[in-house]
Amino acid sequence: MLEFLSQQKPKILIIGDFMVDNYTWCDCSRISPEAPVLVAKTLKEDKRLGGAANVYANLKNLGADVFALGVVGDDESGKFLQENLKGEFLIQKGRKTPFKNRIMAHNQQVLRLDEEDTSAILLENELIALFDEKIKDFKAVVLSDYAKGVLTPKVCKAVIEKAKALNIPVLVDPKGSDFSKYSGATLLTPNKKEALEALKFENLEGKNLEKGIKKLKEDFALRYSIITLSEAGIALFDENLKIAPAKALEVYDVTGAGDSVIAVLAFCLANEIEIFKACELANEAAAVVVSKIGSVSVSFDEIKSFKHVDFEKKIKSKEELLALLKQNDKKIVFTNGCFDIVHFGHIKYLEKAKRLGDVLVVGLNSDASVKSLKGESRPVNSEFQRACMLAAFYFVDFVVVFDEDTPLELISFLKPDILVKGADYKDKIVVGADIVSKVELIDFEEGFSTSKIIEKIKDKK
């Protein structure tokens, strides 16, 4: 599918809130003598396409022939967008084009300064007329709504009705709690928070997810209903509920992930790709984006590289791992073992462990440690081979090798949130239990063990 898509150049029209994302990179190593605040010394500035413009950049990077329709102010940000996007922009004098300035220090966002006018545009009729003039040449339409006043109910209604009459799919990245203005669109892509607000549900757990996503489809006359679930992936409702699981290995910045999702979905629908396959591909695109910093676009080459990820990069020293874990406010799950001959029982155990948090770290006994615990004939596989096998599983985020007989020193160093052991530790002392917030015991699959596998092989000889 990737080979086919990478050769296509569908014409896609984007209407919405085009904005500028500015990144001011600073050194924040001093406290001001005037007040208890950081002093930010500017090092460089980086101006990027944001909002609907980032969707445009994603589609262009994917190879689409993209055309932008929008309204901007008579200011520097408006000029920047006109110079960097192919399309037509109506100029509303005195209106501020959305400009978001992110103050960055040591790869972390410290502060964001926004300049914008969120009132409804005064040029609705002119924008609709421009759309009517252009629409017949396109294979898909994207409405990218950031609640900055361009996609008014009148504009949305006119765009959706016209496109629907021409059998052109309309994909909407919605904003706000009232989705009625998007009624009749092909699909919406709200995130979990946006969906909860629109549905007025307390949560989307268990049966509530299917109930809610189906309600969105029915209430707003959609062809497909989609909810993006962050680390849980993408939920799709067509005739029934399907989940495309998330693919991210490392998350540094979620900025722009939603833009990448709708860009890939639009590209796929413009090429008549089956919707669930499109969702799976959108997940892979989002995984690429969240591994970078800032609003960035994604290409099919990057998605291909991600699909063939070098899993050895998941094998870290404890120092490297601690630095990575500190960058994210995630729930860290830790388990450990020899994992000499990986079997079905190991797989189910690790899969269950992953579900307990956001990041699963596996502490792996080194060759010397295994020999000390199991005897001179072990391990069967070297520590590098064992680490690679564990890292190859999508539910394992990191593998770290330790030399000691127990993982106490490693647990003390990493300080995970949850420590996972097998249910056979129920009446035993769990090493490191006093360091973590919680200990979870998981039942093993019966009948599976490395020792039994080794004995079985010996018996056959």
UniProtKB/Swiss-Prot annotation:
CDD domains: RfaE_like (cd01172)
Residues annotated to bind ATP: 191-194
SUPFAM superfamilies per UniProt: Nucleotidylyl transferase, Ribokinase-like
Keyword check for S-adenosyl-L-methionine: no
A single cellular component GO annotation: cytosol
Transmembrane segments: none
Listed name of the protein: Bifunctional protein HldE
Record function comment: Catalyzes the ADP transfer from ATP to D-glycero-beta-D-manno-heptose 1-phosphate, yielding ADP-D-glycero-beta-D-manno-heptose.
Region spans: Ribokinase: 1-312
A Pfam family: CTP_transf_like
